[in-house]
């Protein structure tokens, strides 16, 4: 089937009480493997390119490869930019055919984060892309994540003034492997969800690697509909390579390298399968996709200074021949 709108995927997650996995890639051979495993599981999936990966994986090439693989599948597939480095990169992802983009202004001052995220939202919506913002920085240890958790009232102000469709929250989650068991602040997550309910903004959890299953399920109950995974996938992929090299320490012929890479991909796909089961997204095919009822509250355009307008684009335009099904 054609690529699906990210917001349609998230809407179904919210209605049916599960989360979609957002799986980072670092090569053009990975989307097909991941989508095949998602197809086997009957699970929707978001295939994600992080902003830092653009020099290695061209956005347009990535979008075309992923869209081609999605057409062969019967499960909903979206393409997402994670942690977009700046507005220019975010625009390139929109033009390439991503169905959603994340502009990460979390390291900026609050007002500058609001200002630039609002520009990203205006730009993304003119391309038909959903836009994710981040409030509260994701650290790499307990020491720094406790200092920068998302404030519920600030989250309300941020969403109201920017109009973001998806908000990445910091509630004790972190990138990379956790040193010990992560302690998610569920009370804070519940407060954030209640604060944002009038605005139709979806919540996403980054740093999903290593979070226990009961914490994942509780997070979903409290409104998380998208969970990002990368570290675990890389770890399992590397284990696949190591296992292959242990069995075949010397060059074995023309298929040696392809077989080694296939072992790595199998590790990636196994990680996706484990996560999809934990996120309760298996067996969720196309039925019921569609936008949520109720209209999203528009951003408060009087809440800040004027921002530059961007050139208008046709709604739903997708560069490079990539498109998604706008009738789902």
For the regions a protein language model found, what residue spans apply to each?
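A short N-terminal beta->alpha junction/helix N-cap motif
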Residues: 18-26, 50-54, 259, 263
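Generic enzyme active-site microenvironment
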Residues: 80, 132-134, 204, 275
